[in-house]
Structures are given as C-alpha cells and as structure tokens.
From Swiss-Prot:
Keyword RNA-binding attributed: no
SUPFAM superfamilies: Immunoglobulin
Pfam families noted in UniProt: V-set
Source species: Mus musculus
Region listing for V segment, in residue ranges: 23-114
Keywords: Adaptive immunity, Disulfide bond, Glycoprotein, Immunity, Immunoglobulin domain, Receptor, Signal, T cell receptor
GO biological process: adaptive immune response
Gene3D superfamilies on file: Immunoglobulins
SMART domains, per the entry: IG
GO cellular component: T cell receptor complex
Span list, region J segment: 115-132
Name by which UniProt lists this protein: T-cell receptor alpha chain V region CTL-F3
Cystine pairs: 44-111
Length: 132
C-alpha cells in the first residue's frame, strides 16, 4: 500500500489522539476493609483536558453497576443512601464519603469521568468490605 506522506501524518496524529486523550481517573485504594459504623472515604482524583462530568458507580455482588452520583458543578454535595461526593475542580478530586459504614455498603465502587458526552473513563475501582 502506497500512501502520501500527508495522509500518513494525519493517520499517525489521529491514532495518537485516540490513544491518549489526556483523561485519566485514579482510585488510590484497590481494597478498603473497615468495621461497621466507621466513616468511609473512597478517593478519586482525575486529570482531564476539559471540564469533565464526574460519576460514581456501585456494583454489588452478582448485580450490574448502578449510577450512585453524578456531579456537574463545583462544590455541590448531593447525598444518596448516606453517601455524599463533592467535586473539587481546584484539586481535581471527587471523593466518595459516608459518615457511618453499613454492612450493605460492601460492594465495588468505580469513579468515572466524561467530557461533554464522550466516552467514560473509569478508575480501577475500589472494593469496600464492611465487617460487623
């Protein structure tokens, strides 16, 4: 196959942009184990070229992942099932917190970001195990 040099350059550029769009999500803890009643904090930091939308998903054993939170503006603090998450654009963080862990909170938690409807970029996930 014989391509013109400008066509090759465009293809290489497109492949580079597709491979590295500048978005990443980091969940520093892969496994968190704590006693029922203690506070929970699951860390999520991100890097993004644009101003992203952030999400937390929860996946209980033998169930599909479910959306737990979405955040579109700075310093909003929605609450769901006792959990809350605050988006801090200044520190590029969207940590998930709960004042008192329950046994039913044991699950896999994923932080994710999206830029204006583009694909979701997920963190590695954090498995929370709550013991009596």
């Amino acid at each position: 196959m014989n391509m013109r040099p400008d066509t090759c350059s465009v293809l290489v550029l497109l492949l580079m942009l597709r491979r590295n769009n500048g978005d990443s999500v980091t969940q520093t803890e892969g496994l968190v184990t704590l006693t029922e009643g203690l506070p929970v904090m699951l860390n999520c930091t991100y890097q993004s070229t644009y101003s992203p939308f952030l999400f937390w998903y929860v996946q209980h054993l033998n169930e599909a992942p479910k959306l737990l939170f979405k955040s579109f503006t700075d310093n909003k603090r929605p609450e769901h099932q006792g959990f809350h998450a605050t988006l801090h654009k200044s520190s590029s963080s969207f940590h998930l917190q709960k004042s008192s862990a329950q046994l039913s909170d044991s699950a896999l938690y994923y932080c994710a970001l999206s830029n204006a409807g583009a694909k979701l970029t997920f963190g590695g996930g954090t498995r929370l195990t709550v013991r009596p």
